[in-house]
Amino acid sequence: MGVTWVFEAEQTAKSVERLLESIGGDLHGTFIVDVTPFNPPTPSSDYPSNVVMHHSKCPQSTFSICPKDTFKKSPKAVCDRGFDLILSKLSSGLIADNAGKIEIIGNEYSLYKDWMIRVGTATQGTTVKGVVVEIEYDPSIIVIQCKDMMIEFVKSVFNKYHETLPEIFKITEKPESYTALDTMWQYLGIATKLRKKT
């Protein structure tokens, strides 16, 4: 997994896919991301919610984040796939908010061997909430090495969205390795925003 940039697109998934095909993108497969909040039985500031996420790029992993203001302040973990099964047994402490679950399902495109672009439709239950695009630059996992290249790519392909940088691009000044948790934090932010849409 390389450095990734996730954003909500204003176009339909089909129009983004046509755009990718027009610049040489090859359909590589499909992908799915799910974001499920687990909340305490009674809302309390002492006991925050926990969000459990999965990404088909990491099929054996479950990502768990207790969201705070920033990524650095948020308790987070990467667990074995069975972690969400354990949470379901802790219903006295955390209850799955299945009505708040967001699923993003779509297609993966490879472009020039270095880029993987995932375009998916986000749904909450039976309601379509939006289109999400994930751009992954595979040659490096060092954020500051990829940042400018990714900004130029987004700018040249989409002609927008390049001004809304992911938090990881803004806070990273030293050569730090990018991890899958950084990607899931971006998905969490988008899912939170999409949940509020009517």
Curated annotation (Swiss-Prot):
<comment type="function">
    <text>Component of the Mediator complex, a coactivator involved in the regulated transcription of nearly all RNA polymerase II-dependent genes. Mediator functions as a bridge to convey information from gene-specific regulatory proteins to the basal RNA polymerase II transcription machinery. Mediator is recruited to promoters by direct interactions with regulatory proteins and serves as a scaffold for the assembly of a functional preinitiation complex with RNA polymerase II and the general transcription factors.</text>
</comment>
<keyword id="KW-0217">Developmental protein</keyword>
<keyword id="KW-0010">Activator</keyword>
<keyword id="KW-0539">Nucleus</keyword>
<dbReference type="GO" id="GO:0016592">
    <property type="term" value="C:mediator complex"/>
</dbReference>
<protein>
    <recommendedName>
        <fullName>Mediator of RNA polymerase II transcription subunit 20</fullName>
    </recommendedName>
</protein>
<dbReference type="Pfam" id="PF08612">
    <property type="entry name" value="Med20"/>
</dbReference>
<dbReference type="GO" id="GO:0003713">
    <property type="term" value="F:transcription coactivator activity"/>
</dbReference>
<dbReference type="InterPro" id="IPR013921">
    <property type="entry name" value="Mediator_Med20"/>
</dbReference>
<keyword id="KW-0804">Transcription</keyword>
<dbReference type="GO" id="GO:0006357">
    <property type="term" value="P:regulation of transcription by RNA polymerase II"/>
</dbReference>
<keyword id="KW-0805">Transcription regulation</keyword>
<comment type="similarity">
    <text>Belongs to the Mediator complex subunit 20 family.</text>
</comment>
<comment type="subunit">
    <text>Component of the Mediator complex.</text>
</comment>
